Amino acid sequence: MPELPEVETVKRGLAPAMEGARVAKLELRRGDLRFPFPDAFADRVSGRTIVSLGRRAKYLLVDLDDGNTLISHLGMSGSFRIEEGRIEEGAGAATPGEFHHARSKDEKHDHVVFHLESPAGPRRVVYNDPRRFGFMDMVGRADLAAHPFFRDLGPEPTGNELGAAYLAERFRHKAQPLKSALLDQKNIAGLGNIYVCEALWRAHLSPIRAAGTLATAGGRPKEQLNLLVASIRDVIADAITAGGSSLRDHIQTDGSLGYFQHSFSVYDREGQACRTPGCGGTVARIVQAGRSTFYCATCQK
C-alpha cells in the first residue's frame, strides 16, 4: 500500500496537470470502488474548476471552486495517469505514483476519468485500480477535519505539531510496542510500515521496546525521543525527495522511478549486514500485528 511519500509524489505529479483546470466531465465507469461513489458524484464534480491539490496522511485531496473537496485513497493498487491532448487510448501517458506491476495497466481497470480543459489544452486524468481497494468521497472543505477519515488523525510527521513533548504525552505509561505506537494513525498520521522501520533504525531504537520507556513518569520526553522525531522527519523528507519507494514499479510523472528503496537500511534486508558503522549485527525479520518488521537487534535497543 502506498505510504505518505508515495502519495505526496502522486500529488506533486498531478498538480501541474490538474490545478486550475476545469473538469469538463467526470466519467465513472462503474458504480463503486471499495465503497460506492457519493450520490450524484459525477454531476457534482463535472463543470467545476480544480483550485488546488493537497494531501492529508495517505489521502489525496482535490479542492474544487464550489468549496467542496474530493477525497481519494489509492488502496492497494490504485494509480493515476495523465494523458495529454486528444491522443489514442493509452498513448503518451505519464503515471505519477504507480504502485503495481505493468500488467495492472490494463484499461479494463480504468474506473474514473477526469476529462479536463485548461489553457494548456485538453487532458485526461485516469484512475486505474485492479483490486478496487481505493475509494473516493466528497465533503465540504470546512467540514474536512470532522470527516470520519480525518477526525481522529494525529499530526503530520513533517508538521510543526509533531515533537518529542507531544509523543511523550501520547506514549506515557504505554506498554504497547514502539513500532505499533508509531503506526497508530491517532498518534502520527501517514506513517506506514516501511518508513517506521527505517526511522527506528536511524534512531537506534528497537521496534519491540515499550513506547512508554521513551517518556519519564511525569510525561517528559527522554533524549531518545528527540532523536526519534528527528529520524522520522528525515526519513520522510528523504523518501519524498527520492520520489518514494518503487517496490512495485512506482513511476513518476516523467517516467522515472522512485529510488528510495535503494537506500533502505533495514526494510526487506533480512539476513544482511546492518549498515550502522561498526555494528556488526544482522538485520532480522519478525512479525508484529501481522506485518513484517525489519531491525537490527545489535544496535537497536
Curated annotation (Swiss-Prot):
Biological process annotations from GO: base-excision repair
Entry-linked InterPro entries: DNA_glyclase/AP_lyase_DNA-bd, DNA_glyclase_Znf_dom_DNA_BS, Formamido-pyr_DNA_Glyclase, FPG_cat, MutM-like_N-ter, Ribosomal_uS13-like_H2TH, Znf_DNA_glyclase/AP_lyase, Znf_FPG/IleRS
Keywords of the record, alphabetical order, are: DNA damage, DNA repair, DNA-binding, Glycosidase, Hydrolase, Lyase, Metal-binding, Multifunctional enzyme, Zinc, Zinc-finger
Give the highest taxon in the source lineage.
Bacteria
Disulfide partners: none
Name its co-factor(s).
Answer: Zn(2+)
Reported EC number(s) for this entry are 3.2.2.23, 4.2.99.18
Report the cofactor remark: Binds 1 zinc ion per subunit.
What is this enzyme's catalytic activity, as reactions? Hydrolysis of DNA containing ring-opened 7-methylguanine residues, releasing 2,6-diamino-4-hydroxy-5-(N-methyl)formamidopyrimidine; 2'-deoxyribonucleotide-(2'-deoxyribose 5'-phosphate)-2'-deoxyribonucleotide-DNA = a 3'-end 2'-deoxyribonucleotide-(2,3-dehydro-2,3-deoxyribose 5'-phosphate)-DNA + a 5'-end 5'-phospho-2'-deoxyribonucleoside-DNA + H(+)
Which stretch is the leader sequence?
A: none
Zn finger region (FPG-type) = 265-301
The active-site annotation reads: P2, E3, K58, R291
Binding of DNA occurs at H109, R131, K174
Q: Does the keyword Coiled coil apply?
A: no
The protein's matches in Pfam families, at most eight in alphabetical order, are given as: Fapy_DNA_glyco (PF01149), H2TH (PF06831), zf-FPG_IleRS (PF06827)
User: What are the protein's GO molecular function terms?
Assistant: 8-oxo-7,8-dihydroguanine DNA N-glycosylase activity; class I DNA-(apurinic or apyrimidinic site) endonuclease activity; damaged DNA binding; zinc ion binding
What family name appears in the similarity comment?
Answer: Belongs to the FPG family.
Its biological function?
A: Involved in base excision repair of DNA damaged by oxidation or by mutagenic agents. Acts as a DNA glycosylase that recognizes and removes damaged bases. Has a preference for oxidized purines, such as 7,8-dihydro-8-oxoguanine (8-oxoG). Has AP (apurinic/apyrimidinic) lyase activity and introduces nicks in the DNA strand. Cleaves the DNA backbone by beta-delta elimination to generate a single-strand break at the site of the removed base with both 3'- and 5'-phosphates.
Give the record's subunit note.
Answer: Monomer.
Q: Identify this protein by name.
A: Formamidopyrimidine-DNA glycosylase
Natural source organism: Rhizobium leguminosarum bv. trifolii (strain WSM2304)
